[in-house]
Amino acid sequence: MVNWQTLFMVSLRRQGSSSRYRYKFNMENITHQVFPRCKQAFKKANLSYEYCDLEGKLYNASLMDLQKMLLRDINAPRDHVFKIVRTDLVEKSSKKRIQHWEQIAPIFDHPLSLYENLLSEMDNDFKPSFEWQQLIEVRSRDDQLKLQRVVWPKSIFSNFCRGIGVKKNTYDRLLKQNNGEVPMFVNPANAKPLPLFQVGDDATIGEFDGIGIFPYFVVKHRAFFVTEVDKLKTKIISPLCNLNERKRTDKANAGRLLENEKGEPFYVDAKGAASRAADGNAVTLKQLLERSVSHKTLWSKQTNKDRTCPGDILRATILSNDFSIRQLRTEFCKNFILYNIFTILQRNKKSIRDFSNDNNVPSFRFNWNVWDSYIWKQYQEAESMTLPADQASLINYKTKYDSFLQDLQTYSTLVISEMKWNQFSIFQNNETSLSRFEHITLILQTILTKSKMIRIFQPNLYKFMQDDLRATLMELTGFTESINATIGPGFANEQSLQSANALKKLANQLLHFEQKIYAEKFRVNRPIQLRPLTLSTNFKIVILDKQNAIPEIFQTLLKFTTQITTYFVKDLSEVELHGHMHCIDKKMLDKSTFMYLYELKYNEDLKAVPPQKEKIVDNIIGLLSNDEEH
């Protein structure tokens, strides 16, 4: 399990010293770039619209409904713009400006219209989406029988109903109450008769009394109609409800419903929603925005005029399918990490040659290190994934993105280490060769400005990075075209992959020990304070490499990864430890590689006896590390 707060601290300790490159000083501007982009987009003639129908205000929309909109946002053509269509009862005289548009527009990748449409303003080609959204009460013709909680779609679809489905026990009860005759219920919208059908236990009724039968939209419901005439009736397109019909359906409303990822309804009552919100989970966009206010110190300064949670963080939280404030904190950490990776390039622009006026761009050779090849392989795998079209594929896609971002964070940390190690030679180039940093730039720049995954989960930061890095060496050298031929032969074998994985594991464990030493607290109510780097002088890291398998280049690179003095040994007896150095943590990385963290302690009292489980683990690691290799 990735600890994103640990990775956040790693990134925070390595951020640029100038406020010009700091996250908080730039995030408001990055988010606000949405507004001129939207304004410019809606000035164009012959716009192609993505119409999203909604029962109610977008600000009050359920996060599950918003997630469905964002899935459309992910898959819509790039030149399309989004517009909300209200299918609930809205007075024509009411303002059609979207409430809190400035907070909502940055959540979308595509431009979102400032104004919403009413259903009555749409032409006949517009078809609202069919979704289970409410519970209603239906009564029998004689008003003697009633079903209080019947699963029902949006009110505008009421005319499409062809019956009421109930489970066997409810069917038998109604039959008994109606003197053995099958009762006939009435559609609240149009007073038309609705026959009663018995549905199986697998029907999506759950704890409710029944469900409306809508065979035009639900294929399973067509099984209730067996005669040829009845089958034809299921294909008849009924008119959408008019204003009076919708009012009558809304009068029969008995509660709100949401759909899960399978299109099945589940009940959301006010009390349950309030309880979930109290536990840190939001149900609506309004709740998520309101609860995020307590975390504004993470992404903004007191002097910022707009301290709203950045749209990228809100978007990633909604797409994660975990609507808790804990998840919002996690998505903030990822947004911060990605921004700091970008600043590696931003801070070193002067070290990159400008070929914009050179008609004879030289053809460069690319020399790949293992860590370059590894991140490029992960990037290729991520880019090869199909865009998510539903919630199940979205969850898999998000998991892959998180894994890739963790690898990208590790790569950026190794790049910073390499820059410290070769602080002069890394920038040296000539007419036929790229500098090492130019090569790194090409890799990072390609990923940051071309990645589909980054655009999907961090669209505002993605566009900002594209704009900032627009004049690129990458396009001129044909880097993306020649890169696969260059990387293939050197990284196709299993040994190279194992070597890269070993380096990644070593680097990540070093960073874990680093965080254990500094142990800064992740605060949301006031700015996070970093502890002084000099704190590390009381610590040492020892890496026991029993088979002497770690290449020297890896050893040097890892020594520059952290401020903590790091030793590589084949036997623990090779390490000269001060008399007061005590092992405070150890980790087995594989059967022949172990990592130890030592701390200098004076006048240490007798240690408390460790828990039995921890003691067993320590003993096993100790035995393995002392074994002789045969």
From Swiss-Prot:
It comes from Saccharomyces paradoxus. Transmembrane segments: none annotated. The keyword Mitochondrion applies. GO terms for molecular function: RNA binding. GO terms for biological process: Group I intron splicing; mRNA processing. This is Cytochrome B pre-mRNA-processing protein 2. The gene is CBP2. Appears to be specifically required for the splicing of the terminal intron (bI5) of the cytochrome b pre-mRNA. Can also stimulates the splicing of the omega intron of the precursor of large ribosomal RNA. It is found in: Mitochondrion. Its main location: mitochondrion. InterPro entries: Cbp2 (IPR016424). Keywords: Mitochondrion, mRNA processing, mRNA splicing. One of its GO terms (cellular component) is mitochondrion.
